């Protein structure tokens, strides 16, 4: 389909990560470290967990008919954090802490700055955190995303009355593979 006519969840973030590698001449993780993690003081974020920090990595669980059991499977190598991955995905696989993730969320709320340092331009933050999909295109989204739109790599609350959980209009955020989630509500600052 033509861009702007439909919505489909895709591997676009993975492709963007590969483009970043070609343009920057760096591995994706190195680019993220230099451009985001270091300026944002994100000291516990990356695509693998060093041996010295593995005791801090929580065990993920899944619900089965016999109760909760540790999650041991992987998907596209996401879940294997004891070594650097061959492919650093633009769409999955980062490991972080609540503290580190909050620095990224705070930077977005501050319009692209963190502790006086410019990380992203205000225009980039606006592109990420404002609804970009036309109403007709939003109809293509999964039922579980009813009431949401998308910015660029960010989910945006467009109609809070249609959302199954707690949300307010303009709230934006993202969720991770094993249930982590962040949301900013800029109007509530």
Regions found by a protein language model. Name each.
Residues 9, 174-176:
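Conserved strand-loop elements at the edges of beta-sheets that form or border functional pockets
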Residues 150, 188-189:
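Residues at beta-strand starts and edge strands
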Residues 1-169:
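Short, surface-exposed loop or secondary-structure junction motifs
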Residues 171, 178-187:
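Short, surface-exposed beta-strand/loop micro-motifs that present aromatic residues
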């Amino acid at each position: 389909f033509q861009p702007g006519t439909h919505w489909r969840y895709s591997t676009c973030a993975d492709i963007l990560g590969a483009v970043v590698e070609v343009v920057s001449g760096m591995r994706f993780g190195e680019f993220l470290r230099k451009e985001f993690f270091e300026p944002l003081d994100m000291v516990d974020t990356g695509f693998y967990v060093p041996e010295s920090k593995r005791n801090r990595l929580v065990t993920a669980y899944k619900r089965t008919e016999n109760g909760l059991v540790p999650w041991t499977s992987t998907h596209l190598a996401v879940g294997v954090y004891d070594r650097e991955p061959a492919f650093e995905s633009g769409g999955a696989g980062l490991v972080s802490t609540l503290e580190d993730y909050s620095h990224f969320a705070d930077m977005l709320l501050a319009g692209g700055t963190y502790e006086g340092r410019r990380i992203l331009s205000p225009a980039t933050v606006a592109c990420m955190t404002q609804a970009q999909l036309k109403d007709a295109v939003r109809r293509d989204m999964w039922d579980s995303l009813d009431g949401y739109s998308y910015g660029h790599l960010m989910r945006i609350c467009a109609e809070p009355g249609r959302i199954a959980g707690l949300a307010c209009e303009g709230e934006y955020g993202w969720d991770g593979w094993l249930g982590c989630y962040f949301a900013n509500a800029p109007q509530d600052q």
